[in-house]
From Swiss-Prot:
Organism field: Ruegeria pomeroyi (strain ATCC 700808 / DSM 15171 / DSS-3) (Silicibacter pomeroyi)
A Pfam family reported for this protein in Swiss-Prot or TrEMBL: FlgI
Gene Ontology molecular function terms on file: structural molecule activity
Protein's name according to its UniProt entry: Flagellar P-ring protein
GO BP terms, alphabetized: bacterial-type flagellum-dependent cell motility
PANTHER family from the UniProt entry: FLAGELLAR P-RING PERIPLASMIC PROTEIN FLGI, FLAGELLAR P-RING PROTEIN
Stretch forming the signal peptide: 1-19
NCBIfam families per the UniProt record, alphabetical: PRK05303.1
């Protein structure tokens, strides 16, 4: 039984050693293997009275006239203002090595004052890249991300009904010319540049090929010599190295989102010894004017007399909290929670701690 337990521990040791490892293809971008952004504008039709008000969005009428004329319908001088049409921008990402005839997902977003794209159909829309060439053509039924309804005195909106997607809604009509097989050097661009991580990638790749085929050029680039790998093609090299496991060096970073009050801190965040006190002062001023009328049968005018109510509120009982030297993430969280403050107040506290030089991490505000 003891021997079986020992063998089981030996089997699990490699798994524990690789616990923090990440696949190489999740850490780097392969030079030349990249997608391209596409954009176009067109019309969504078939809306149930939730389209653009053509008086407020005249470009919708212009787009509609151009499309109808291309279809052989002469609308010159005609005055038509349907409410079931909306002008939209169409965006898509053309993946690397996409071939003619393959389909890609697209996103549709209203340009004008359309209330909802729910149930509409995008009619044939060319999608251009930055070079002005058409690489795909989009068409299909829009899947909106919300719903809206309105009456004479009230309206309700859930989600974002003016934006939606069309899965496989565009067909590729032109390929991006890139000859991967002609590469003699393959560069790996780190998504999070770091000298330690780049050095580990160099070591891991050289170990996989039992030779010196990779060289770290800087914190964001590792270069491979294709000939030294003795592989049949650069594609075979990528296929061989993309699943190599590497443990990245994580930076100490605090990211806060002021709009949502979200705070995310890495495990390596450290804080020097600091004392924190937080309180809030609320000043409320309310104007409530009153009308003073003259007595009956008396000469006089009605006078509006201003009346102001002012009050100040201060939260009592908020104490001073001390965070010890070289505190870890759990110490930081415990110290902030000891103040009993909201996430938005915590953001202000972290900003102040960073300004005081006690927060030893990159501070990112979004």
């Amino acid at each position: 039984m003891t021997l079986i337990r020992l063998l089981a521990c030996l089997l699990f040791l490699p798994c524990l050693a690789q616990a923090g490892a990440v696949r190489l293809k999740d850490l780097v971008e392969f030079d030349g293997v990249r997608g391209n952004d596409l954009v176009g504008y067109g019309l969504v039709v078939g809306l149930n009275g939730t389209g653009d008000g053509l008086r407020n969005a005249p470009f919708t009428e212009e787009i509609m006239s151009n499309i109808l004329e291309r279809l052989g319908v002469n609308v010159t001088g005609e005055d038509f203002r349907p409410k079931n049409v909306a002008a939209v921008f169409v965006t898509a990402a053309l993946p690397p090595f996409a071939r003619v005839g393959s389909q890609i997902d697209i996103t549709v977003s209203a340009i004008g004052d359309s209330k909802s794209l729910l149930g509409g159909t995008l009619i044939m829309t060319p999608l251009n890249a930055a070079d002005g060439q058409i690489y795909a053509v989009a068409q299909g039924t829009v899947l909106a991300g919300g719903a809206s309804a309105e009456g004479q005195a009230a309206s309700v909106v859930q989600g974002v009904p003016t934006s939606g997607v069309i899965p496989a809604g565009a067909r590729v009509e032109r390929e991006i010319e890139f000859d991967l097989g002609s590469l003699t050097q393959l560069r790996l661009a780190l998504r999070e540049p770091d000298f330690t991580t780049a050095g580990r990638i160099e070591t891991a790749v050289n170990s996989a090929f039992n030779g010196r085929v990779a060289v770290m050029r800087d914190s964001g680039t590792v270069e491979l010599d294709i000939a030294a790998t003795q592989a049949r093609s650069p594609a075979h090299v990528i296929g061989r190295i993309e699943n190599i496991l590497v443990e990245p060096e994580r930076k100490a970073r605090v990211v806060v989102d002021q709009r949502s009050g979200t705070i995310v801190m890495g495990a390596d965040v450290r804080i020097s010894r600091v004392a924190v006190s937080q309180g809030s002062l609320t000043l409320r001023v309310e104007e409530a004017p009153i009308a003073v009328q003259p007595n009956p049968f008396a000469d006089g005018d009605t006078v509006v007399v201003p009346r102001t109510n002012a009050e100040i509120e201060q939260e009592p009982g908020i104490k001073l909290a001390e965070v010890p030297e070289s505190a870890s993430l759990s110490d930081v969280v415990a110290g902030l929670n000891a103040l009993g403050v909201s996430p938005r107040d915590m953001i202000d506290i972290l900003k102040t701690i960073k300004a005081a030089g006690a927060l030893h991490a990159e501070f990112v505000v979004r």
